């Protein structure tokens, strides 16, 4: 099992990840959102391209 040698190393890695602004953004305009009908149901068609 992997064990960390020091908590300072963990804190440094957490700070590095917290400062990463290039990761997932919830305000992504290209992200597809499912539209729901009045009953709260949604559907999607998945097409596999060759």
UniProtKB/Swiss-Prot annotation:
Source organism, top-level taxon: Viruses
SUPFAM superfamilies per the UniProt record, alphabetical: Nucleic acid-binding proteins
Keywords, comma-separated and alphabetical: DNA damage, DNA recombination, DNA repair, DNA replication, DNA-binding, Metal-binding, Zinc, Zinc-finger
GO molecular function, one term: DNA binding
Note: Interacts with the polymerase and the uvsX and uvsY proteins.
Assembly mode: Homodimer in the absence of DNA, monomer when binding DNA.
Described function: Binds preferentially to single-stranded DNA and therefore, destabilizes double-stranded DNA. It is involved in DNA replication, repair and recombination. Binds ss-DNA as the replication fork advances and stimulates the replisome processivity and accuracy.
Protein's recorded name: Single-stranded DNA-binding protein
Naturally occurring in which organism (per UniProt): Enterobacteria phage RB27 (Bacteriophage RB27)
């Amino acid at each position: 099992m992997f064990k960390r040698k020091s908590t300072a190393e963990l804190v440094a890695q957490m700070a590095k990840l917290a400062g990463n602004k290039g990761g997932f953004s919830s305000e992504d305009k290209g992200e597809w959102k499912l539209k729901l009908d009045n009953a709260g149901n949604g559907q999607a068609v998945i097409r596999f391209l060759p």
